[in-house]
A protein has these predicted regions:
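Core catalytic alpha/beta fold that binds nucleotide/phospho-ligands
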Residues: 1-212
Length: 212
């Protein structure tokens, strides 16, 4: 299926979301397959994510992708900075020739409530409650998933395993308007870095991205 969302974030950075409805053979015509991936669904997600890179930048060099010890894919020459995410039937990718980037896509689910203590501070949880005051429990679950996705995109932007989602990744404010918004964040690993994470809700999913 075609792209369900695409945005030229700035002159050198592009974001895309792909609904995976094709068989493996569709992607294998262009994308090399990692032989270590044996699960059919994970293999399809892997192929779709890499296919999307070249949809955004046709000259993107698939063959030069390397995997860091942190499992983050990268290009040694850093000609392109990129991030890939997939969840269920969707793959998301962001590619830039000049900015550091991170992206995450998540399915909205009530399961996130069971693990909220692993990624949300008390202050952040109180902020979510204030945003859902007089609104439905559905919005509460949507915002929980969104905060998880926001922090995942920050984690991918940084690209190092040694990140504590509560200690190092702080969401200071969320500005929500209908099905999209912006989160003002602080990254506190090595030095205090202010970052904005944009997010979009679509088809019961959330995609979040950060560019710096």
């Amino acid at each position: 299926m075609p792209l369900v969302y695409q945005q030229n974030i700035n002159p050198v950075t592009k974001l895309g979301v792909w609904h995976i409805g094709e068989p493996e053979n569709f992607f294998l015509q262009q994308v090399p397959l990692e032989r270590s991936i044996t699960h059919p669904n994970k293999r399809l997600q892997h192929l779709a994510g890499r296919y999307l890179l070249q949809e955004l930048y046709p000259q993107f060099p698939y063959s030069l992708i390397r995997i860091a010890a942190t499992r983050k894919p990268f290009l040694e020459n850093e000609l392109y900075h990129f991030s890939i995410s997939h969840c269920g039937a969707y793959a998301a990718a962001i590619v830039s020739t000049g900015n550091r980037v991170g992206v995450d896509v998540e399915l909205m689910t009530t399961k996130v409530i069971k693990v909220k203590h692993k990624f949300l501070s008390q202050k952040e949880h109180a902020m979510i409650h204030s945003l859902t005051l007089n609104n439905s429990i559905e919005l509460y679950h949507q915002l929980l998933t969104t905060t998880w996705s926001i922090k995942e995109s920050l984690y991918k932007w940084y690209g190092d395993n040694e990140v504590d989602f509560i200690e190092h990744l702080h969401i200071e404010q969320i500005n929500l308007k209908e099905n999209q918004g912006i989160a003002d964040c602080l990254f506190l690993k090595d030095a205090a870095i202010e970052l904005q994470v944009h997010f979009l809700w679509f088809n019961n999913n959330c995609v979040s991205w950060v560019v710096s």
